[in-house]
Design a protein with these regions (language model features):
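Active-/binding-site microenvironments in catalytic and ligand-binding cores
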Residues: 1-217
Length: 217
């Protein structure tokens, strides 16, 4: 019998039924086709995907908001490999400096935010009022010089407040902070973990899907 792995998969599978940002022009799709290899009797299955680089669990690169910013294929491979801290946020509206101050965040930390958002994927539809990082919270995290931010919904900024959506992204990715969006922390407790999160290597990409896993430390 194989021993149970300590690793926890915190990424969401890509599928046509997955929750996606309503303003993305094309919903994700994965279509499988089976055919026979020419000259043989062997059947193989191959799939074709239609996805936006921000569908599902993904990493934002600076290029997402800055035309001359670093692209996803320029991300150092070890940027999101190593110690990470899961912080549980109690505020059901936004992530604010007042609550962040309780957690003694240190320079260089990789911080993953677990919020009430982790229960929203169970609903099977996009929730507009998800917990996001407030503009002040983004400035606080920038000033703390964190290296990575992860959140358990489709964006770090607000869906309803587009000024916040833009500002939060610019403050964080514009200061060399890598952002992981749409991670599944529903089965993860607050605490210290080892993280491995590697994006697909898309040339000149503004973002890319990633497989993210955690192991308790």
């Amino acid at each position: 019998m194989t021993a149970k792995s300590e690793w926890i998969d915190i990424s969401y599978p890509l599928s046509k039924d997955m929750i996606h940002w309503p303003e993305n022009p094309v919903p994700p799709s994965v279509e499988s086709n089976t055919f026979t290899i020419k000259g043989s009797s062997v059947n193989v299955t191959m799939s074709q995907m239609t996805i936006n680089t921000h569908h599902g669990t993904h990493i934002d690169a600076p290029r997402h908001f800055f035309p001359d910013g670093k692209t996803i294929d320029q991300m150092p491979v070890d940027a999101i490999m190593g110690p990470a801290r899961v912080i549980e946020i109690k505020d059901i509206v936004s992530i604010k400096p007042e609550e962040l101050a309780d957690h003694n965040i240190q320079p260089g930390e990789r911080i993953l935010f677990k919020t009430v958002n982790s229960s929203y994927y169970q609903k099977g539809k996009f929730v507009e009022d998800f917990v996001y990082i407030s503009t002040e919270g983004a400035h606080y995290l920038r000033d703390k010089k964190v290296s990575v931010i992860g959140i358990d919904y489709l964006a770090i900024g607000s869906f309803r407040d587009k000024e916040n959506l833009v500002e939060v992204h610019k403050v964080l990715v514009g200061n060399g902070i890598w952002v992981i969006e749409a991670i599944n922390l529903s089965a993860v407790k607050a605490g210290m973990y080892e993280i491995i999160c590697l994006p697909i290597k898309i040339a000149n990409g503004d973002a890319a899907q990633a497989r993210a896993i955690l192991r308790p430390l």
